[in-house]
Amino acid sequence: SVFDHYFGEAANGKYDGLFYGWDVVNEAVIGNSYRTDTVSAAESLDEIRHGNNSSWWHVYKSNEFIINAFRYANQYAPKNVELYYNDFGETDNTKCEGIVKLINDVKAADGTRLDAFGMQAHYSVDSFSATQFKTVAEKYAKAAGKVQLTELDFKSSASYTSGMATQESEYTKIAYCHKQLFDA
């Protein structure tokens, strides 16, 4: 299988030094809990209506697939490669609770390793709060050990029409948001 081939090669050092970290599990939290799939087990997993639901939850009926992913990554990843959980919407207080719970659950399980949390960092110029960013980043650092911004971007303000007349002002707003974030 691809899994055996890749991890067999990784264990033999073929990819040494190529990666500093692995995104082991991505986007497994919704609200303050795990994403689940409440659709009948008799249904095909490729049904479009599953949407944001987790097909793996559909198979396992628990968070064990997340634990196993980190267990296998810990077993096969080179020890110098950091293992990440990565998610979006991470500045929302409710989602922060769910993400911290996932991190704590993984770290408490036997045979796992989780070194860092990846904040996808999709923000809006209109609603970005450096204070909120700092608050949740500190919670993630306490739970995971390290935090990384993995996909940082700022959506333009709702009033921006992409015309040349307002472009400089909009770019200034975006630059200011970046400054606030890095000063937090």
Predicted regions and their residues:
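Alpha-helix N-cap and loop-to-helix initiation/capping positions
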Residues: G51-F65, E90, T94, G98, ...
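Aromatic-lined carbohydrate-recognition surfaces of secreted/lumenal glycan-active proteins
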Residues: F19-N26, H58-K61, F65-C96, V147-L152
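Active-site groove signature of glycoside hydrolases
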Residues: V2-S54, Y84-F88, D115-G118
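Distinct, well-ordered alpha-helical segments
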Residues: S33-D37, A69, D92-D110, S129-A137
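Active-site clefts of carbohydrate-active enzymes
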Residues: V81-D92, M119-V125, K142-H178
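Extracytoplasmic low-complexity repetitive segments enriched in small/polar residues
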Residues: S1, D37-V39, P78-K79, N93, ...
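Glycine-enriched alpha-helix->loop->beta-strand junction motifs that scaffold or abut catalytic
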Residues: D110-L114, A143-K146
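An active-site-proximal structural segment forming one wall of the substrate-binding cleft
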Residues: S1-E27, K61-Y76, L102-D110, K173-A184
